[in-house]
Amino acid sequence: MVFCLENEMPHRLLGSAMVHFHASEVQQLLHNKFVVILGDSIQRAVYKDLVLLLQKDTLLTASQLKAKGELSFEQDQLVAGGQLGELHNGTQYREVRQFCSGSGHHLVRFYFLTRVYSEYLEDILEELSYGPAPDLVIINSCLWDLSRYGRCSMESYRENLERVFVRMDQVLPDSCLLVWNLAMPLGERVTGGFLLPELQPLAVSLRQDVVEGNFYSATLAGKHCFDVLDLHFHFRHAVRHRHRDGVHWDQHAHRHLSHLLLAHVADAWGVELPKHDRLPDPWIEDWSEMDHSFQGSHKQPPDFREKLALPLLPPFHLPPPMSFPYPLEPSPPPLFPPLPQDTPFFQGQPFPPYEFKYNAMEDFSMPGCGPGMNFVPGPLPPSVSGPVSHGQHRGPVVHRGKPRCVLNNPYHVPRIGGPCRHRLRHSDRLIHTYKQDRRGHAHSGTWPG
């Protein structure tokens, strides 16, 4: 789903047929692409399934989904936090992971977030400004925001959503695709590790809060012309694939999520989607039947503002930036020069020893990737002629100039042909200047769910 200008004729909605990607096709789609994923444990599973699918056509195991903060997962590397720091369930928990393929043509990085906007997010944006520019950013933060930051959490969430979209609009280059994942539906009983025992009474209203938070985040993302993938809609009937904790999902759900995400990305980049002759998937077929019955009872997309009695968004003014008590030093120069176009991410230098500290001088944009999978990708489509923005890597995309294939969802708005955002180029990106006192290791406690 995307938001764009008014008075644009809607494209024909496709049926609920699902596109399935093989590993070789994912390798081609993300060839020479830098993918950044930010969010909670759900987004960590999104990262893990994408890393796995970049290497082989298998599903995650239950133990891989359950593991958190491990030193290595499927040839990736834990860069910071997790087992390198202290395992706890506090809002200062950090975990940074990175996967670089053996060929050096795929780079995927994950940052664990406990709040959609914070000083830590500004640190992340500053780190990204020193390395290659991301080609794809996938982000969500909702459950922690609505359950761990006081009684006015929804108001704070809205303010922080506006902050993060403004900053992403300023920092990311024009060529970067940002996809905001809406939070997935919760179960009636929520026992995820992010919800402390003393906060269990909040679980009663958290399901409704997530729907309301999704409404605000989709609206604000649309205001900034960012793409939105409505996972709440797509997984509303997948109850049996949700874990007993009411929050997390099994490996089949996450592979389905990966296919939805990759289809959205391929369509946004104008890539011809693969066509496979395959037997129907009973799991997907069950969803299709429920989707049709849902659509039959709503000739038009439902008005969720009326159903949820949500107020219209008033004119919103960005709160003043956070202030800090001492003067700031100028930002240090990057440790590595920008990558030339079509250069693999792997440069052969060893990964520097990394102690988990907030230090702008420490950069892990281009680590040695270690042993990788020596797979041979399929034939690549011809590269596309035209300018490539600074720091970007030309991949094997096929621009067809065809209408977007948008799946049915309550927020459908068609995408116009050209870009609707006008952001600063990579070389002119704004770097956050106010800094908070750098913390060392995160506080001790229990492991997050």
Curated annotation (Swiss-Prot):
CDD domains: SGNH_hydrolase_like_5. Coiled coil: none annotated. It comes from the Eukaryota. Belongs to the PC-esterase family. This is PC-esterase domain-containing protein 1A. It comes from Mus musculus.
